[in-house]
Amino acid sequence: MKELGRLITAMVTPFKKDGTVDYAQAQKLALGLLDSGSDGLVVVGTTGESPTVTWEEEHALFAAVKSAVGNRGKVIAGTGANSTQEALENTLKAEKIGVDACLLVVPYYNKPTQEGLYLHFKTIAEATKLPCILYNVPSRTITHMNPETVIRLSQIPNIVGIKEASGKLDDIAQIINNVRPDFTVWSGNDSDTLPMLAMGSYGVISVASHLVGNQIKDMITSFVSGNTEHAAAIHRHLTPLIRSLFVVSNPIPIKYALNYLGVEVGGLRLPMTEADEKTAALIRESLKGYTIDLPIK
């Protein structure tokens, strides 16, 4: 679904000092991201600490961000779960709230078969009118969704695309070659954005775009318009920053970077911990080489 945008930011969830969700800051951050290159936002995905945000908090975040954003950008709700019934109920709630689409992660921990994955996503998609984006991230879920399963799911009309974070470029090429023409493939890894564009993907669901959204947008736009040398130069320039943002588990580095730059997003909920000094020093050093696109207010 091309209208969801080429550059989508997987937003962090801001917390107050007491650990509660800071909905006002989430709204402010959402608008800042749209002002710095993002076409849309994933709310309460991996970067938004979905495992430790309650359903009630999720729904309130969906509503708060959508209220702030309005028609300025697309709001994609992270509604996935490793229980099909819970994911279905969460998706239906997000639909009632009025989000633009949902992101459904491959079920984690319980290790379903490929047929189980197919039936999981099919069951949810057929129960909602929302556009559904699949999310393959085996580094976190253990289970890898095979290309054949994605291709099969792409025949369901409101399964509109996939966030592909496996890093398996051969599998991704197979997906792009065999899905229906309007099925959209986004990179789920910032470092894979340009290589995947070269293979025919559409864009990226990004973490680094919290900081350098305009530059990532320039890279994508340049590639699409045929200025591949400029796109490649941006990719090479951003690579050290991207590497520093994944030196430990996401969203630890990006939350540290935002707080360090003056964008108050608070800490993390256990079992995630804040960046240690070695990690923090590496991120601070990396940031010195970059212009930050996000408005700092």
From Swiss-Prot:
Pathway: Amino-acid biosynthesis; L-lysine biosynthesis via DAP pathway; (S)-tetrahydrodipicolinate from L-aspartate: step 3/4. It is found in: Cytoplasm. The keyword Metal-binding does not apply. Transmembrane segments: none annotated. The keyword GTP-binding does not apply. It comes from Dehalococcoides mccartyi (strain ATCC BAA-2100 / JCM 16839 / KCTC 5957 / BAV1). The gene is dapA. Catalyzes the condensation of (S)-aspartate-beta-semialdehyde [(S)-ASA] and pyruvate to 4-hydroxy-tetrahydrodipicolinate (HTPA). The lineage of its organism: Bacteria, Bacillati, Chloroflexota, Dehalococcoidia, Dehalococcoidales. Keywords: Amino-acid biosynthesis, Cytoplasm, Diaminopimelate biosynthesis, Lyase, Lysine biosynthesis, Schiff base. Homotetramer; dimer of dimers. This is 4-hydroxy-tetrahydrodipicolinate synthase. GO terms for biological process: diaminopimelate biosynthetic process; lysine biosynthetic process via diaminopimelate.
